[in-house]
Amino acid sequence: AETIQRQFQHWGLTLSEQQVAMLLLKGLSFREIAAVRQTREKTVRQQASAIYGKSGLDGRHEFSAWFLEDFLVVDAGEASPG
């Protein structure tokens, strides 16, 4: 989690954006995030848009994939069938 927080700070995310970003990574919907943070869904959508803009990533899937990429690197030997 520290590595993720450092990356959020590197991107210049505000504290609120960091909280939303972490919930996005955990797979919560905008509606669920709004309920958890006791705010409007529109606010969460705006924060998500700011997160994607600051990170230079295009949407939720690319945002999540950015963090998963290091874990999903497959050795060529592991990728061969059977």
Regions found by a protein language model. Name each.
Residues 3-43, 69-71, 75-78:
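Helix-turn-helix DNA-binding segment
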Residues 44, 51:
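DNA major-groove recognition helices of helix-turn-helix
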Residues 6, 49-50:
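Positions in alpha-helical segments
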Residues 21-25, 52, 64:
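Hydrophobic residues on short alpha-helical segments
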Residues 53-82:
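Basic, Lys/Arg-enriched C-terminal extension of HTH/homeodomain DNA-binding domains
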